[in-house]
Amino acid sequence: MDEHYDVIVLGTGLKECIISGLLSVDGKKVLHMDRNGYYGGESASLNMNQLWEKSHGKEKKAPETLGSSRDYNVDLIPKFILSSGLLVKMLLHTDVTRYLDFKVVDGSYVYSSGKINKVPSTDTEALTSSLVGLLDKLPLRKFFIFVQNYEENNPATHDGLNLKITTMDALFKKYGLRENIVDFIGHALALYLDDSYLQQPAHDTIMRMKLYADSLARYSKSPYIYPLYGLGELPQAFARLSAIYGGTYMLNKPIENIVFDEEKKIIKVTSEGETVTCDKIVCDPSYFPNKVQKKGKIIRSICILNGPIPSADKKFESLQIIIPQKQVKRQSDMYVGVMSSAHCVCPKGKYIAIVSATVETNEPEKELAPAYALLGPIQEKFVYISDFIEPIADGTADNVFISKSYDATSHFETTCEDVMDMYKRITGKDLVLTVHPNILKQQEEAGNQEQEEQ
Amino acid sequence: MNNNNKIFQFKLVLLGEAAVGKSSLVLRFVRGHFLDYQESTIGAAFLAQTVCLNDTTVKFEIWDTAGQERYHTLAPMYYRGAQAAIVVYDIRSEDSFERAIKWVKELQRQGSPNIVIALAGNKLDLAAKRKVETAEAQQYAEENGLLFMETSAKTSQNVNELFVEIAKKLPKTPTTRPGSGRVAIAPIDNGNTGKKNKCCN
């Protein structure tokens, strides 16, 4: 193991695995280690025994009424994939889609006045949705048509405004949209966690609305897709990509020491008495407690249910509910993701609802009450509170590139933005999300091979 | 596709210790060649080949380990949903046979319930240095309901036969993977992935 690597990656969470894969495909020599004996770190999906042990320790076994442990693949960090979003672009860029199977999420809901409604996102839906009051229908329809037609580089579609300057708040006012409508546009379509976007230029929000609409248009039921067997498949798939392009994988590797050799400009990493060197380290925040800072807490509550949730369409085997902050007098949104055996994450008949939110009070679980009220009887509950951690420095000075922990958003856009930003800091170049030339080369070779055989 | 053959596609994974000849077996089967010094698996770890039976065509989507077996870091995703597995050992190495048995147990515990497992004692061309007796492996395979063959990727002995036996044993039912309603993730802009349908002639 006495070797030099371009990059050593520590931790096999999703972000680390995507970066490891991208760097290996680029031809970098990568060593990827994890102190745990399994892939995924915080982004792993657990079976019931693992989940139970995490909350209750080893002594007590999970009750048999929960069903077979191995039928469970429970995400610790619940998120859905926007089907036209950045993660899909990264999956295509690397051809990692071939290792995974996805299904569409059945429904997307937003909470309003104590009940949940399907999210209207097109001009026609705006007219029929019960969420939209009679007086709001016409202005909303006009606004949706404006957004649909908006093209960044075509001023004729900008309604005479400079939307890189005009705030979203001003744009909403121009269209005469009232608070309830603004609330669902900002939080259920543009997917903002809080209201700070209102004072930002309108362009970004419009692009996020278009992303939602594009994603919805792909598979029509909802804008989200989700992999069979849980999100824990994603880091494993990117790790496989990295391995295929020469990355070396080692699990169960505790890191004992990391020394910076200023003179030779290398970093020495020691694990189990063996030392390897590298130019750069990429890792999750847990590997450098002295180089990161806490920025708030996130609560995630995993609820096992014995049937579909009573507040939504009973036929739906998977869905998302967004609870906008103002609806429940909070400063940030709350999310509920519901999954079932349709995505191979639990036994038949069971449903998993995961509620997540940024912690705002000293009694975080009480904050989740409005979400719990939507779920019906809960058979078993696993509640976790975790810190949101960010690196203090950007890594360019010490060559240690640390990812941010996974935030409370319901999708992977911020996750991928962090990955793209890290990639740029690590390599000095932008990540271009078209299919990678090295992947194309391999695809072509495989194609030629098939033709020869014919 | 001018015959009326039904085509069934299956995911097949290779398992076994490093350097027992997993990649060589696949390359012999898919490309019909053998390299004395096959490099550790890099780059192409996803191959396809078809086997024609009487009235059906079986297309194998073959997953190689990408070297992740070296430090025992193969991810569960690798054999997830696999309908067939070839567990390979080197007939000159008892350790590799022990490791193969561990893989069989892992597949029985974590793999798909109806997975077809084949045990392959590879490097039959080097039988002079044999350490694992045919009868011993045969008996283990029978007791555990595995297909069993000794193979040589170098001489091609029993390689096609092994895949044909697996193809015969696989259930030919329309939905072979869990979770109906899966969606294809295709590029958003100019959707040309260059995937071609093919069948044997």
Curated annotation (Swiss-Prot), chain B:
Q: Which UniProt keywords apply?
A: Cell membrane, Endosome, GTP-binding, Lipoprotein, Membrane, Nucleotide-binding, Prenylation, Protein transport, Transport
Renumbered to this chain, the positions carrying a covalent lipid of the kind S-geranylgeranyl cysteine are 199-200
Where does it live in the cell? Cell membrane; Endosome membrane
Gene Ontology molecular function, alphabetical: GTP binding; GTPase activity
| Record keyword Protein transport present | yes
Residues bound to GTP are 16-24, 35-41, 64-68, 122-125, 152-154
Q: Which domain of life is it from?
A: Eukaryota
Description of activity control: Regulated by guanine nucleotide exchange factors (GEFs) which promote the exchange of bound GDP for free GTP.
PROSITE patterns given in the database record? RAB
Topology relative to the membrane: Lipid-anchor
Looking at the UniProt record for this protein, which Gene Ontology cellular component terms does it annotate, in alphabetical order? early endosome; early phagosome; endocytic vesicle; endomembrane system; endosome membrane; lipid droplet; macropinosome; pathogen-containing vacuole
The record, for SUPFAM superfamilies, names: P-loop containing nucleoside triphosphate hydrolases
Chain span(s) of sequence motif Effector region: 38-46
Query: A Pfam family for this UniProt protein?
Result: Ras
- Name the Gene Ontology biological process terms: intracellular protein transport; regulation of phagosome maturation
InterPro entries per record: P-loop_NTPase, Small_GTP-bd, Small_GTPase
For this chain, the family text in UniProt reads: Belongs to the small GTPase superfamily. Rab family.
Biological role stated in the UniProt entry: Required for the fusion of plasma membranes and early endosomes.
Q: What is this protein called?
A: Ras-related protein Rab-5A
Q: What does the record give as the organism's lineage?
A: Eukaryota, Amoebozoa, Evosea, Eumycetozoa, Dictyostelia
